[in-house]
Amino acid sequence: MDHAPERFDATPPAGEPDRPALGVLELTSIARGITVADAALKRAPSLLLMSRPVSSGKHLLMMRGQVAEVEESMIAAREIAGAGSGALLDELELPYAHEQLWRFLDAPVVADAWEEDTESVIIVETATVCAAIDSADAALKTAPVVLRDMRLAIGIAGKAFFTLTGELADVEAAAEVVRERCGARLLELACIARPVDELRGRLFF
């Protein structure tokens, strides 16, 4: 591409309440994950979205709340997780998480139909949940694309994937941001400019 994609301003407009912040931790130990969740919630009144074992024996923890609350909870979580101990696989703190993310974070949802669209699609597969959420958030804040599907860890060996649709130039801009944010955590990124009719709107049968 000729230039870096323009990044949308994710900061809420003046006078409007903050969008919820999001904190995510992936741990290699289920027992450590539970103690991390306990410490995080005792430190600040964040709302616990998820604290559960997932595929490959990992523990996944998600919290939301005001920015200051999530910051404090994440500080406590890191202290108990033990930086450098090997228990903390990945972490993510998003002060202003994009609004399209939230409905995909608690449990798998049925993706919206897009059979009638002529949109292009990218499929992103990552090694960690944090990488998927972080890169999807960045892509959504960079280009006018739509998050169609997101699956996190359960039933897919602890990996994560998501799909984005939009005009070809927009999904290509989103893909550039995804690659940058994921780095070595990106397992695969595929772009289909014009999905075949049998797959359009339902990539997974």
Curated annotation (Swiss-Prot):
Its main location: other. One of its GO terms (cellular component) is bacterial microcompartment. Coiled coil: none annotated. Changing S55C: Binds a 4Fe-4S cluster, exposed on the concave face. Keywords: Bacterial microcompartment. Residues 21-106, 120-204 form the BMC domain. It comes from the Bacteria. The record marks R52 as: Gating residue. PANTHER family: BACTERIAL MICROCOMPARTMENT SHELL PROTEIN PDUJ (PTHR33941:SF11), PROPANEDIOL UTILIZATION PROTEIN PDUA (PTHR33941). This is Bacterial microcompartment protein trimer-1. It comes from Haliangium ochraceum (strain DSM 14365 / JCM 11303 / SMP-2).
